[in-house]
UniProtKB/Swiss-Prot annotation:
Keywords: Ribonucleoprotein, Ribosomal protein, RNA-binding, rRNA-binding. Transmembrane segments: none annotated. Disulfide bonds: none annotated. InterPro entries: NA-bd_OB-fold, Ribosomal_uS17, Ribosomal_uS17_bact/chlr. GO terms for biological process: translation. This is Small ribosomal subunit protein uS17. GO terms for molecular function: rRNA binding; structural constituent of ribosome. The gene is rpsQ. Part of the 30S ribosomal subunit. It comes from Paracoccus denitrificans (strain Pd 1222). One of the primary rRNA binding proteins, it binds specifically to the 5'-end of 16S ribosomal RNA. Belongs to the universal ribosomal protein uS17 family.
Length: 82
């Protein structure tokens, strides 16, 4: 089974070797026919404490590291400025 990869924004880096990543997804509501935004927070392992609040990162699923951590930070994605 392939590992899931998600992209989100770091909203907290207060814990040692852990960041909280907010992942937002958009989908069309089947009845209302409008775009709905849904978000979820994931706790991800950051071994080197290199990611800060506001960074856009990619996280990948992994074996459980602790009670709440099931994800590892892969890379930081570059922000595209318009």
């Amino acid at each position: 089974m392939p590992k899931r990869i998600l992209q989100g924004k770091v909203v907290s880096d207060k814990n040692e070797q852990t960041v909280t990543v907010l992942v937002e997804r958009r989908f069309k509501h089947p009845l209302l026919h409008k775009t709905v935004r849904s978000s979820k927070k994931y706790r991800a392992h950051d071994a080197d404490n290199q990611f800060k609040v506001g960074d856009t990162v990619r996280i990948v699923e992994c074996a459980p590291i602790s009670k709440t951590k099931r994800w590892t930070v892969l890379t930081e994605t570059a922000e595209v400025s318009a």
